[in-house]
């Protein structure tokens, strides 16, 4: 047995030795053969002209090392092959499928290392999937290493795609297919390390993405001197791409992020930071087709921060639309994909904070909106120094508007929204606010009848709320220590009639848009103010947003009003001046979009009225005497109630309708029943006319008698 076993071992060892010798000989022989025949094989089988000074091939492992390589295309204009032109200092390939490379034109390797490559790469033309063209990948690099390379990558039509200098790159599990290139996600990989300078990426000949330097350290990428530069002007972009709506220009001192993942048609980034970004948005009049796909892949961003940014948006004519300065923001868990793009908010998000200063917005040629700061997070929004101001004076405004329109002037030192929630339920926007606080607001509303009437009815607040397309609810609103002024003028007024409400404090409950079924749609407004700055006034105003007739109730009580204070209001229209004390004014109006009606009651002490001429300069003494004669002192007596009934024939605003109701009540209370005055005046005129007629008759009678007497004397003289 021992002899047989020893003999078997000798035979086995001898066989192994023979195989090793044969393997070595084959490897050496193949290596020798390949070195001598590879140029001829490349010439016959490869689409490239390749020269080298050193080549080492291991047939067993598929490892290849080549040095001082020069490469170029045999057919530079063939768009079906990847174009390669340039040199490589050293090339190291591990586990290459040699026969696939030589005979099937497919490069399949575990690892490839390029040392000092200076290459110009032209991508092959994407395959037409509809024609069933073979989409087999010509290059399969699992792991890629680049050391100190200068790379230019062009599209098949020679348009620039990527340029980078001094590139050092490490990619693991790298994949690239024609399909991904077509969908704008050209590569996917598991991990990376990169550094380079003067990076340029061109997107659809619309933008150049530039970076002075790119580097990674400990998994974090830093991009310095970033620029997203448009290749077209705003006008050229609008003409060439009529279905695109915005052109962007972006610069940033530095961008950093980590945990970049390109996988399964998804891009993921974390800890994204922008330092001093400057964003310019140039809008056009283009409209994107509804069927257009907005996202070819998913984007996930976690923990984004922006520091000291500026944002400017331009209108299609190049003028400023809005501007944000000194912007700082933080946001996490952002998701953008095809599904989210269908919603009113085109992305999902988690916690966020935002702060900006010197915000300016031009909503149109008549106004400019600005604020000194805006600070917000998931729970609270604070606005400082809000202003909404006209861009022209009242005369210019009246000349420029085609029809009658109110002119607003608004200044608010501080606005707070506390406990708000913005959701995107079923791709529909929904906003809910617990508390809205407005501090020390100044609002002036000026209305003029000088321009032609607007045939379009002015909408009340209930209709304005109904027209908001998404559910909006503000549970509690407070207007604190504010001033509201309403002025109106017409052709006959020498100065605008003016109402003012100082020390205005208002509580509003349940502002809503009547978009949530089963929810309360009644809005209640409770207010306290000083009418004309001196007279305590309370107001209760209610309306139902869901009421199609825009019905409302408006109840007010005014006390201790110096009658002279209302002259600014009544003199321009009624041509009346008052003095004395108005003890109280009470009215309870019910109205809708067709008119207003209700009781108006005023008590007074020593109230005197002066009727003026149309220029409000001369007193009509006699009519003033008669008017005051008919006005009774209501102290201690039951005052007379005026029943207001005013029709909204001109379809003016709610403020105008309230004005007309109050004006009607004041006119009835101050002047009284004008028919009595008119009757008295008519009676006096009639009596005066009768007296005059009697006097004239007597004069005529005396003249007749005198004429007869004179005739008799003349006749007597003739006889004599």
Regions found by a protein language model. Name each.
Residues 122-130, 286-290, 451-457, 573, ...:
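Flexible, surface-exposed loop regions and adjacent strand-edge segments
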Residues 229, 279, 389, 530, ...:
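Short, solvent-exposed aromatic-acidic interface loops
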Residues 131-154, 291-316, 355-357, 420-425, ...:
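Solvent-exposed beta-strand/coil patches in large extracellular/periplasmic or lumenal scaffold regions
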Residues 2-12, 540-545, 550, 557, ...:
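Extended terminal
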Residues 2-47, 158:
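N-terminal type II signal-anchor transmembrane helix
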Residues 48-49, 53-126, 132-165, 172-227, ...:
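Flexible beta-edge/linker motif
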Residues 16, 234, 393-395, 452-456:
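Acidic/polar low-complexity surface segments
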Residues 159-164, 319-324, 449, 454:
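Extended intrinsically disordered, low-complexity coil regions enriched in Ser, Thr, Gly, Ala
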């Amino acid at each position: 047995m021992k002899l047989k076993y020893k003999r078997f071992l000798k035979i086995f060892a001898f066989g192994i030795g023979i195989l090793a010798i044969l393997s070595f000989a084959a490897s050496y022989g193949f290596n020798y053969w390949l070195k001598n025949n590879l140029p001829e094989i490349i010439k016959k089988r490869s689409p490239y002209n390749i020269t080298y000074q050193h080549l080492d091939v291991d047939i067993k492992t598929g490892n290849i090392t080549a040095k001082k390589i020069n490469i170029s295309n045999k057919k530079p204009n063939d768009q079906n092959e990847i174009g390669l032109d340039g040199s490589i200092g050293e090339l190291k390939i591990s586990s290459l499928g040699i026969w696939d490379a030589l005979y099937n034109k497919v490069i399949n390797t575990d690892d490839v290392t390029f040392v000092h490559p200076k290459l110009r790469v032209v991508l092959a033309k994407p395959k037409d999937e509809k024609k069933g063209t073979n989409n087999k990948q010509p290059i399969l690099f699992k792991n890629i290493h680049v050391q100190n390379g200068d790379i230019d990558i062009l599209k098949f039509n020679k348009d620039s795609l990527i340029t980078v200098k001094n590139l050092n790159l490490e990619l693991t599990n790298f994949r690239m297919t024609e399909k991904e290139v077509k969908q704008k996600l050209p590569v996917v990989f598991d991990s990376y390390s990169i550094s380079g300078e003067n990076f340029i990426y061109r997107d659809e000949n619309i933008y150049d993405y530039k970076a002075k330097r790119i580097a990674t350290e400990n998994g974090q990428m830093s991009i310095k001197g970033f620029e997203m530069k448009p290749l077209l002007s705003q006008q050229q972009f609008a003409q060439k791409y009529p279905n695109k709506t915005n052109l962007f220009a972006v610069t940033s001192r530095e961008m950093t992020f980590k945990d970049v993942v390109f996988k399964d048609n998804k891009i993921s980034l974390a800890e994204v930071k922008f330092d001093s970004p400057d964003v310019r948005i140039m809008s056009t009049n283009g409209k994107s087709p509804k069927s257009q796909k907005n996202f070819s892949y998913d984007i996930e961003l976690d923990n984004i921060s922006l520091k000291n940014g500026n944002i400017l948006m331009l209108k299609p004519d190049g003028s400023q639309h809005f501007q944000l300065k000194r912007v700082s923001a933080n946001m996490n868990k952002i998701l953008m994909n095809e599904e989210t793009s269908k919603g009113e908010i085109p992305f999902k998000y988690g916690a966020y904070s935002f702060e900006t200063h010197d915000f300016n917005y031009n909503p149109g040629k008549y106004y400019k909106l600005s604020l000194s700061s805006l600070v917000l997070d998931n729970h609270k929004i604070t606005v400082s120094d809000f202003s909404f101001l006209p861009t022209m004076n009242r005369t210019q405004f009246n000349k420029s508007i085609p029809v009658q329109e109110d002119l607003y002037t608004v200044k608010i030192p501080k606005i707070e929204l506390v406990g708000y929630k913005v959701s995107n339920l079923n791709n529909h926007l929904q906003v809910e606010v617990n508390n809205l606080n407005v501090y020390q607001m100044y609002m002036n509303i000026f209305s003029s009848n000088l321009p032609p009437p607007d045939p379009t009815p002015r909408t009340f607040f209930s209709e304005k709320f109904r027209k908001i397309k998404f559910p909006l609810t503000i549970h509690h609103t407070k207007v604190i220590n504010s001033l509201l002024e309403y002025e109106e003028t017409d052709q006959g007024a020498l100065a605008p009639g003016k109402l003012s409400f100082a020390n205005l404090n208002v509580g509003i409950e349940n502002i809503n848009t009547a978009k949530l079924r089963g929810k309360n749609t009644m809005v209640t407004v409770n207010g306290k103010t000083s009418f004309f700055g001196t007279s305590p006034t309370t107001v209760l105003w209610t309306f139902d947003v869901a009421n199609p007739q825009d019905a409302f109730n408006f109840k007010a009580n005014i006390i201790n009003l110096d009658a002279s204070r209302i002259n600014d209001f009544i003199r321009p229209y009624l041509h009346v001046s008052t003095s004395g004390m108005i003890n109280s004014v009470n009215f309870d109006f019910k109205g809708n979009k067709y008119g207003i009606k209700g009781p108006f009651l005023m008590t007074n002490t020593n109230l005197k009225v002066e009727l003026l001429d149309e220029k409000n300069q001369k007193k009509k003494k006699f009519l003033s005497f008669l008017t005051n004669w008919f006005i009774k002192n209501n102290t201690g007596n039951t005052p007379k109630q005026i029943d207001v009934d005013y029709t909204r024939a001109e379809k003016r605003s709610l403020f105008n309708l309230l004005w007309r109701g109050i004006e009607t009540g004041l006119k009835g209370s101050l002047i009284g029943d004008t028919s009595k005055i008119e009757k008295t005046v008519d009676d006096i005129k009639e009596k005066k006319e009768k007296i005059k007629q009697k006097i004239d008759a007597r004069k005529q009678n005396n003249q007749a008698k005198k004429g007869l007497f004179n005739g008799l004397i003349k006749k007597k003289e003739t006889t004599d």
